[in-house]
Amino acid sequence: MTMKMKMKMSVVCAVVVVALFLIDVGPVAEAVTCNPTELSSCVPAITGGSKPSSTCCSKLKVQEPCLCNYIKNPSLKQYVNSPGAKKVLSNCGVTYPNC
């Protein structure tokens, strides 16, 4: 086998390996639209200390990637950092972000 042929085989093998990794990646994550009003169902639990509804928890889980943006927003920071919000996050099984 010539050197040129070995080089071509190496390139083909590398392409096949990369293709196998790409095939196994799975579905691409959908982008989340960050909209704090989606969390309005959580307000009674945050402000009143009641148990969060299943709607609240499901919305929190969808909006979880947005929490750091909410914390960085001066208008929303006080609500997301409140003890009530932290309790709701915990009750819903959503980890408080470390931004």
Curated annotation (Swiss-Prot):
* Name used for this protein in its record: Probable non-specific lipid-transfer protein AKCS9
* Gene3D superfamilies reported in the protein's UniProt record: Plant lipid-transfer and hydrophobic proteins (1.10.110.10)
Protein task: Potential lipid transfer protein.
Note the SS bond partners.
Answer: C34-C68, C42-C56, C57-C92, C66-C99
Lineage here is:
Eukaryota, Viridiplantae, Streptophyta, Embryophyta, Tracheophyta
Record's keyword terms, sorted? Disulfide bond, Lipid-binding, Signal, Transport
Write one Gene Ontology MF term.
lipid binding
GO biological process terms, semicolon-separated: lipid transport
